[in-house]
Amino acid sequence: MSSEHKRSLPAVTLAAIGVVYGDIGTSPLYTLRECLSGQFGFGVEPDSVFGFLSLIFWLLVLVVSLKYLTYVMRADNAGEGGILTLMSLAGRNTSDRMTSVLVIMGLIGGSFFYGEVVITPAISVMSAMEGLEIAAPSMDSYIVPLSIVVLTLLFIIQKHGTGSVGKLFAPVMLIWFLTLGVLGARSIIANPEVLQALNPMYAVRFFIEYKAVSFFALGAVVLAITGVEALYADMGHFGKFPIRLAWFTVVLPSLVLNYFGQGALLLKNPEAIKNPFFLLAPDWALIPLMILATLATIIASQAVISGVFSLTRQAVRLGYLPPMRIVHTSDMESGQIYIPAINWMLYIAVVIVIVSFEHSSNLAAAYGIAVTGTMVITSILFCTVAVKNWLWNRYLAWVLLAGLLVIDVPMFLANVVKILSGGWLPLALGMVMFIIMTTWKSERFRLLRRLHEHGNSLDAMIASLEKSPPTRVPGTAVYFSRATRVIPFALLHNLKHNKILHERVVLLTMRTEDAPYVLNARRVTVEQLSPTFWRVIANYGWRETPDVEEVFQRCWQDGLTCQMMETSFFMSNESLIIGERPWYLRLRGKLFMMLSRNALRAADQFEIPPNRLIELGIQVEI
């Protein structure tokens, strides 16, 4: 490790604390309260307190420390993580049929994230505001309005970026975790017997004593690990080692101290179950703690919002969502983006959820099913990568998968039973996103295949045009082409109606590769097809923004000179009509047409100057 890297490690680790662990770091606000609130029939008695504390501790160890930090984070694509990245890795060395299954699983996992992201800001901020019930009971009726005000401000500032205020995230979250640890340690010192719950036998006894009821209680325990996917998804921003270092040195000790501190408080004063987190603090510290908790939940919400922006960009670039406007809010950091459509749809959904559920306890029932569903899918995809990509011993990989699913599946099933009491919300939101993603991908493929089937051979067309050239006009024309062997429809229609060609014709294909970045050496390929025709293929990673001007600069190195303001850009604009289909495919076709109408135009994606653009319409039956 270089000295430069050593100097930067503390800063990167601190930044990881501020972004990666926001969601899981605010879980102590409500987790133990929900476990012992009475909904599962558990009283605040020693056996249940010790049992839940033991379960929480060993979930943090087995799921976060072992599964994600030790195993899952090994699966990266050029340093990037996340469920869609894992899906792509898993499908690289498998059969077409198996790849289709893995893609569906990955899209379900991604859809679950969209369902979860609506709940996280709502439950986090409401839990912080509920400190008012302790500090000033008369302010109880203001919890919902204040939560909406805080989140409204958060969503408004998204368009300005979080670069400046983001520098405060890490120090605030560090103070938050230190506060968690101090509050918990004070309580543990007063009642150290609570540390017996570190023994896993208390978790085992919990299941033996409470039998079937203990299974349903897993639906509440899982609240302690919500946000665990962020560790993997944010790997590309901070790297594996800083994320692991932050967890083992700061986050895990602070969480364990706080959970066990709440447990010690409940053993001493069972009536503290109404809000054991805030009752850990002395009276004079309630208001400062509530302010700090609000800041921490805002940061946790910001991390989730940024995460959904990143996931959306990846889905758009990989062809699972229609193109949409993506604004870069920082000249220095490519990961800082803002997507207006997603931002405001998410805001409306969050406000509706807050108004409908009114209290964080009501939302807790909805929380968990998306998280645990994604955990199950992650385990399966990871073991597929281990066997197919890394050539692990098949039997050892299956043993590992069985061990992971022994934890994941019961937690998922325990949350499934909560569907009627709120679990339907993330499932419904996830289903909507899954339908949209699969519809866009499959119908777009169908459209491109139809265009390809009805297209003319490029080589034959060029040979014909060179042999019997039409009228030539000065200048360069760029035709955007999706398929490299078929003549673009815009070129075909230009010849058909205008009977002319420019002196130089460039067929430009913009491709997105299944990788976050593409090496500069592979960015642009230039091929001269004839004295007047060139084919240019530009390759970009899904984290990169296609730039036509950059493509032109690289073309110059290969002997092809193009100037943006001296070039005419031709694009085809498809007008879609639905052919004969079964009723359910007609519905899917109509959804695709609606998505296409609202998608960002290719000219806007590539920032083509409007006065240099010519669009030619074609009608296509789908």
From Swiss-Prot:
Superkingdom of origin organism: Bacteria
Organism of derivation: Pectobacterium carotovorum subsp. carotovorum (strain PC1)
InterPro entries: K+_transporter, K_trans_C, K_trans_N, Kup
Pfam family for this entry, one: K_trans
Keyword Cytoplasm: no
MF-aspect GO terms: potassium ion transmembrane transporter activity; symporter activity
Record gene name: kup
Function, in words: Responsible for the low-affinity transport of potassium into the cell. Likely operates as a K(+):H(+) symporter.
Origin organism lineage: Bacteria, Pseudomonadati, Pseudomonadota, Gammaproteobacteria, Enterobacterales
Keyword presence, Cell membrane: yes
Protein's name in the database: Low affinity potassium transport system protein Kup
GO cellular component, one term: plasma membrane
